[in-house]
Amino acid sequence: NIWDNETDRAIKLGNWYHNQREENILDFSTIEREGVVVPIIRPLVDGTGVKIAPVQKLKDGVYPEHFAYLKSAAICGQADLVTVVNGKIHIIDYKTNKEIKEKGYTNWEGITSKMYKPLSHLDDCNLNHYNIQLSLYMYIMLKHNPKLKAGKLIIQHVTFEKKGVDDYGYPIIKYDPQGEPVIKDLKMYEL
């Protein structure tokens, strides 16, 4: 199925990038952020190798692939990279979509699609969806850590080099001699 092939391609690229970022940061035990050397807090893993949610109280450090949850609201999520430094929580999420849309779809009548209430003032686009996602992660973390303040919410959008398109217009990704996808661009969206 054509759609399944495109879905598989997108999932493989996304997983590859996320795994690369996590492996790169876990090569170190500390890292400098905002002029402060902080520890890298490794994700918790159970006996079978499955990542599990840690205690939600955060201390200064960098948390790759951090599970955040709020039992009272029955919500959880996984932030790609959380940094706690100088009394603030910063969240970065990696996105590997073909594009990040900043505006909702506008039809031939000039009507732009909006989200549903209570967010009906916002365009229905993936940048706003991601903003809500990261804002919810921040909300969860601040509920568990009331002495900390909200820092930056950042989307890191990664695009890959194409060597062409297939018969259906989907991209064919370029790979380097080691078989790794070639990154074309990184764009940061500070929300």
What are these model-derived regions, one by one?
Residues Y63, H90-D93, K152-H157:
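A structural signal for short, well-ordered beta-strand segments and their strand-loop junctions
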